Amino acid sequence: MPEVATRSLPPVPQQEWISALPPAMRIILHGDVGARSVAAAVWGVDFAEQSCRATLKGARATLWLGPDEYLLLGGLDGQVATLETQAAEAAGALELALGRMPHALVDISHRQFALQVSGPHAATILSGGCPLDLDLNEFPVGMCTRTVFAKADIVLWRTQQDVFHVEVWRSFAGYVTGLLREIAVEFNGT
């Protein structure tokens, strides 16, 4: 599937509150606390101590999405020139370190597309399609979760007070960006 990496990304509205993020390395890890400890040492990022939280170190992050599910993101600085090679090397290093420990490790780098929604109305715009309470007190900086945006599954991560990282399946990217554009119409120019 090398051609997937060279496909053009879905059109993203040219508004300052939304932007397409560069391709990144994405690996899903399912494993218990022992696997998490080994993976953290290899990945170079400590895993969060609390569920639905993310940790970031340099250009890598870990998002705790479920009881034994973690999304590992790499190349968040946009410096993933050879995405496939880096993802394969990272997955190989993790697989080798985890050895015979019960775990599942899957490279999903090409499956997803990432958006950044930012600005003073970011939470309100996302609330137009997301059922979660995105008030800063309820969904603080560093929180992440699987949820939906209208009919699309997404991973939502609040990276700063008014900045959200949204992971969506590539096949739903046009749908999600279109809905974001419609919802944001009332905020144009503000």
Predicted regions and their residues:
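Basic, glycine/lysine-rich polyanion-binding surfaces/domains
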Residues: M1-T190
